[in-house]
């Protein structure tokens, strides 16, 4: 069975209640299904807190965090350090054997600089499945942060949705993007069950899909095209629905290629 990548985002890492619900759902799912799971995470809220504490400015361009050279070390520490190890600690608490990774481990996801104007922000592309497949075959839950490294050794901050997409392409995995919202909402705040590229373009033009959600929707559309299968955007808030989601039942917005 092909693996399932669960991308975690939003304020999930800040909420003990949400993490408890998520990991309880993961335990229940793993007990009843043999399907291998991989977690990919960002941690914007962890980074924002740290930057605020250090009195450093947070600047975004087109929904992507601008990452100057003097901030990449701090952001790496927050994402590959604090955020990653927090998730590993929760996995340990729930008796799930897990391994913490970043995109560069085993060359799992290849990363190049996206745009000089964004600084240390990376473009993620499929890499080698060897390391993660080996971990999955031995029953481990890989927990992968969205920090990558270029061929010339430069650390890069990668949008976590895009990182998860590249890793899904690497592994031939299905992909779920878990976030703060229950899916993509229309102009009246109602959840849209299915989304196509043309519908997304229309909602972006109308200003209904904005900022970070544009990045999320485009990442999901890219993933659906690259993988040749639908990608789900859903909320982690409804933990009781997560096992159904992991089984392929849509509970948020299903993005069609």
UniProtKB/Swiss-Prot annotation:
Where's it mainly located?
A: cytoplasm
Q: Which GO terms describe its biological process?
A: arginine biosynthetic process via ornithine; L-arginine biosynthetic process
Which Gene Ontology cellular component annotation is one that this UniProt entry carries? cytoplasm
Molecular function as annotated in GO:
acetylglutamate kinase activity; ATP binding
**Residues at which ATP binds:** 180-185, 208-210
The keyword Lipid biosynthesis appears for this protein? no
Q: What are the entry keywords?
A: Amino-acid biosynthesis, Arginine biosynthesis, ATP-binding, Cytoplasm, Kinase, Nucleotide-binding, Transferase
UniProt cross-references to Pfam families, sorted A to Z: AA_kinase (PF00696)
User: Could you tell me which cysteines form disulfide bridges?
Assistant: none
Which pathway, metabolic or otherwise, does it act in?
Answer: Amino-acid biosynthesis; L-arginine biosynthesis; N(2)-acetyl-L-ornithine from L-glutamate: step 2/4
Catalysed reaction per UniProt?
N-acetyl-L-glutamate + ATP = N-acetyl-L-glutamyl 5-phosphate + ADP
Sites binding substrate sit at 43-44, 65, 157
Its EC number(s): 2.7.2.8
Localization recorded for this chain is: Cytoplasm
InterPro entries cross-referenced by the UniProt entry: AceGlu_kinase-like_sf, AcgluKinase_fam, ArgB, Asp/Glu/Uridylate_kinase, NAGK-NC
Q: Where is this site: Transition state stabilizer?
A: 7, 216
- PANTHER family associated with the record: N-ACETYLGLUTAMATE SYNTHASE, N-ACETYLGLUTAMATE SYNTHASE, MITOCHONDRIAL
Q: Summarize the protein's role.
A: Catalyzes the ATP-dependent phosphorylation of N-acetyl-L-glutamate.
The entry's family comment says: Belongs to the acetylglutamate kinase family. ArgB subfamily.
- Which NCBIfam families does this entry report, sorted A to Z? argB
Q: How does this chain assemble?
A: Homodimer.
Name of protein: Acetylglutamate kinase
What's the encoding gene here?
A: argB
């Amino acid at each position: 069975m092909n693996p399932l990548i669960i991308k975690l985002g939003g304020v999930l890492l800040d909420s003990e209640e949400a993490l408890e619900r998520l990991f309880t759902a993961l335990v229940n799912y793993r007990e009843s299904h043999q399907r291998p799971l991989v977690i990919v995470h960002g941690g914007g809220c962890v980074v924002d807190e740290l930057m605020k504490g250090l009195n450093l400015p947070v600047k975004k361009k087109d929904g992507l965090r601008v990452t100057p050279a003097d901030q990449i070390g701090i952001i790496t520490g927050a994402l590959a350090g604090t955020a990653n190890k927090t998730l590993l600690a929760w996995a340990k608490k729930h008796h799930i054997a897990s391994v913490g990774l970043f995109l560069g481990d085993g060359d799992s996801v290849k990363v190049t600089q996206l745009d000089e104007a964004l600084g240390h922000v990376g473009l993620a592309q499929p890499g080698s499945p060897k390391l993660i497949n080996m971990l999955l075959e031995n029953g481990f839950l890989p927990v992968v942060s969205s920090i990558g490294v270029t061929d010339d050794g430069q650390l890069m901050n990668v949008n976590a949705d895009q990182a998860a997409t590249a890793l899904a392409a690497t592994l031939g995995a299905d992909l779920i993007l878990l976030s703060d919202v229950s899916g993509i909402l229309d102009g009246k705040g109602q959840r849209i069950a299915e989304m196509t590229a043309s519908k997304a373009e229309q909602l972006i033009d109308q200003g209904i899909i904005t900022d970070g959600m544009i990045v999320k929707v485009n990442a999901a559309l890219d993933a659906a095209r690259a993988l040749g299968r639908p990608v789900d955007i859903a909320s982690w808030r409804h933990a009781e629905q997560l096992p159904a989601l992991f089984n392929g039942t849509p509970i948020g917005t299903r993005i069609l290629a």
